[in-house]
Amino acid sequence: MQKKALVVIDIQNDITKNYKEVIGNINAAIDWAKAHEIHVVYIRHENLSAGTRTFKPNTRGAELAPDMKIVSDNIFTKSKENALTSEAFATFVRANAIDEFYIAGADAVACVKSTVFNMRAANYGVHVLSDCITSYDKRKIDEMLRYYESKGCDIIPLENL
């Protein structure tokens, strides 16, 4: 395996229905990563706040979306926006000497944003797959792509992989 990972963030049953518009591209990115011996990682969000209505642990809403291809057991859970706050994921990154990431998933203005910001702050190479991310507010995606680029991320459409 290469020292690279495709990280699919929060494509779960409770995420915005807008994910259905990019799930085909996300699945194509998963196929690409597998074909190129790139680790495929799935990040799940669990909301630990009292009284939460979404992403509750051990509920259908917290499960990965059924129309997403699952090609590895690299499934990590986080309770904060930044995927690197998952100790299990951070350990996986270190154990596999991963230094370059391809990012897909949701939400572009929250968990994707926090994850790519913190990956760049840690000097990792980060490539955001522009047609593999979504948001509750799709109008903000272009703004987020500019933000990611301003932080040193490469912005690439799936067809340019």
Feature locations, PLM:
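Active-site-adjacent betaalpha module
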Residues: 1-5, 24, 28-36, 53-161
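Short hydrophobic beta-strand that contains or immediately precedes a catalytic carboxylate
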Residues: 8-9
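Catalytic metal-binding/acid-base residues of hydrolase active sites
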Residues: 12, 46-47, 107, 133
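Short acidic, Gly/Ser-rich segments with clustered Asp/Glu that frequently serve as metal-coordination loops
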Residues: 12-18
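Glycine/Thr-rich phosphate-binding loops of Rossmann-like dinucleotide-binding domains
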Residues: 17, 50-51
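Flexible, glycine- and charge-enriched loops at secondary-structure boundaries
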Residues: 19, 23
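Von Willebrand factor
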Residues: 33-49
